[in-house]
Amino acid sequence: MGTEFNGLFDEWAHTYDSFVQGEDIQYKEVFAHYEDILEDVVNKSFGNVLEFGVGTGNLTNKLLLAGRTVYGIEPSREMRMIAKEKLPKEFSITEGDFLSFEVPNSIDTIVSTYAFHHLTDDEKNVAIAKYSQLLNKGGKIVFADTIFADQDAYDKTVEAAKQRGFHQLANDLQTEYYTRIPVMQTIFENNGFHVTFTRLNHFVWVMEATKQ
């Protein structure tokens, strides 16, 4: 993941919170139970938390309220500016992404929501291998994102979006890198993690991977 999505992130920054509230009918199901998804990620995290894709700070705020120490990473300047308005003044957000970031001294949990699909499957593997080196035994990765049980589930979801006239959603599903559960299970296990997948709406699953 380089800078190819930064323009999209900057453009989306000022409307992102309306998206997650379900105001765009095409993405209403993608963000169904949004607050519950964030809470689930928070509840599965512990200790010092490295968050990728801070966005407008929604997950970050919940992590801080839960008493976590958070190190935030966000590539978009516009997103960082909006998040800083919502978060405590002393909280700093570092420019970076899933593959290129300043490494904090000690991390217990790595979290992200609605962002890991910006990486190709090969890049996902590189990222998870890197995180495996950062985490001690018992450390965790907790990612919530749109993924699919298998190819058939993906194909049916794309076709359903087209049938409903949700052409922007269908295009999104076909142009970004939404992966399959077997792919992610292999990536995690090959890098020394035990992983479980929990579905929280039609699109989003929470991946909870524990370093062995």
Curated annotation (Swiss-Prot):
Molecular-function GO terms, alphabetical: S-adenosylmethionine-dependent methyltransferase activity
CDD domains cross-referenced by the UniProt entry: AdoMet_MTases
EC number: 2.1.1.-
Annotated S-S bridges: none
Keyword Lyase: no
GO biological process: methylation
Gene3D superfamilies in the cross-refs: Vaccinia Virus protein VP39
Entry keywords, A to Z: Methyltransferase, S-adenosyl-L-methionine, Transferase
Residues reported in the UniProt entry to bind S-adenosyl-L-methionine: G53, E74, D97
Superkingdom to which the source organism belongs: Bacteria
UniProt xrefs under HAMAP family: Methyltr_YrrT (MF_02100)
Role description: Could be a S-adenosyl-L-methionine-dependent methyltransferase.
Family in the record: Belongs to the methyltransferase superfamily. YrrT family.
Name of the protein in its database record: Uncharacterized methyltransferase BA_4603/GBAA_4603/BAS4271
